[in-house]
């Protein structure tokens, strides 16, 4: 796993529901919501209903942000998988989940419910992380050699760690460029170019949110691998919808989760009400 997390915000008050933009990481993730409503995702700010994915959901690798319903307080646990781990954990090529969310039951069948029940019985966040770690390690250990990440992709991922130069990754893979792209997309879920782009963004985001970040956006841009500050700003806006300076001022509690302004939802709601009124007139 790349990382595991758990939230244990138990409270007696009714949950506060809002929306947030989840920023892309290029990696797949698995999340269990153990209290409150099911996980709901939205196609955009104009989507007032959303789509429910139940209380256990898998998010495939993606290079674009998405909108979800944020519920606070919440009790949840999840994991972000290392690039190339999707097929070992879920039994399907990463490219089949790219840019998608699916209910875990579609991939694990009845095991999804059993794991969810076990997590519900765990009394602490630490115990939930321990349980989920065990489940994922067992599934990875039980996977067949067929699901292992090809050595060419492993070499490329190591070369791309800290670099956005796809040519370096292709050269390190030791196979032809076309074969490299096909192998990489199957194992990682994104093409080498898209994966390198989103990981460069994540490096920049890491620098931007450090306790003592590098002075100046130009310094951050160069440290992350961008050509210049203008290039960094364009990419940052494309991924987040806001400028780096605006992101800093918002100071989200979790760097990959950007709260959606309530006004955007209210505007969409009024637009929908006007449309409904026109239709009934």
Each model region followed by its residue ranges:
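Alpha-helical bundle regulatory/interaction domains
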Residues: 1-177, 187-192, 206-227, 243-281
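DNA major-groove recognition helix of helix-turn-helix
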Residues: 184, 196, 236-237, 248
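Positions that flank functional sites
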Residues: 200, 236, 252
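Amphipathic alpha-helical "recognition" segments
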Residues: 193-198, 204
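Catalytic DNA-binding helix-loop module of base-excision-repair DNA glycosylases/AP lyases
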Residues: 179-188, 196-199
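Residue-level recognition of oxygen-bearing side chains
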Residues: 165, 200, 231
């Amino acid at each position: 796993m790349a990382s595991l997390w758990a939230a244990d915000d138990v409270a007696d008050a009714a949950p506060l529901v809002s929306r947030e933009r989840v920023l892309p990481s290029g990696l797949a993730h698995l999340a269990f919501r153990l209290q409150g409503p099911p996980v709901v995702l939205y196609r955009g700010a104009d989507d007032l209903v959303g789509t429910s994915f139940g209380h256990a959901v898998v998010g495939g690798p993606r290079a674009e942000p998405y909108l979800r319903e944020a519920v606070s307080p919440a009790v949840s646990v999840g994991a972000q998988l290392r690039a190339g781990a999707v097929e070992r954990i879920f039994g399907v090529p990463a490219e089949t989940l790219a840019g998608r969310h699916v209910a875990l039951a579609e991939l694990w069948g009845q095991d999804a419910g059993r794991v969810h029940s076990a997590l519900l019985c765990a009394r602490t966040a630490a115990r939930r992380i321990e349980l989920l770690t065990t489940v994922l390690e067992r599934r990875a250990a039980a996977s067949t050699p067929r699901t292992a990440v090809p050595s060419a992709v492993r070499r490329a991922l190591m070369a791309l760690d800290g670099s956005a130069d796809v040519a370096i990754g292709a050269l390190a893979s030791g196979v032809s460029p076309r074969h490299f792209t096909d192998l990489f997309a199957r194992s990682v879920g994104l093409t080498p170019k898209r994966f390198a782009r989103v990981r460069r963004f994540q490096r920049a985001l890491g620098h931007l949110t450090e306790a003592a970040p590098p002075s100046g956006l130009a310094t951050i841009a160069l440290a992350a691998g961008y050509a210049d500050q203008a290039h960094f700003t364009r990419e940052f806006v494309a991924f987040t919808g806001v400028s780096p300076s605006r992101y800093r001022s918002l100071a989200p509690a979790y760097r990959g989760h950007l709260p959606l302004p309530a006004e955007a939802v209210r505007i969409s709601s009024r637009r929908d009400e006007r449309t409904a009124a026109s239709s009934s007139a």
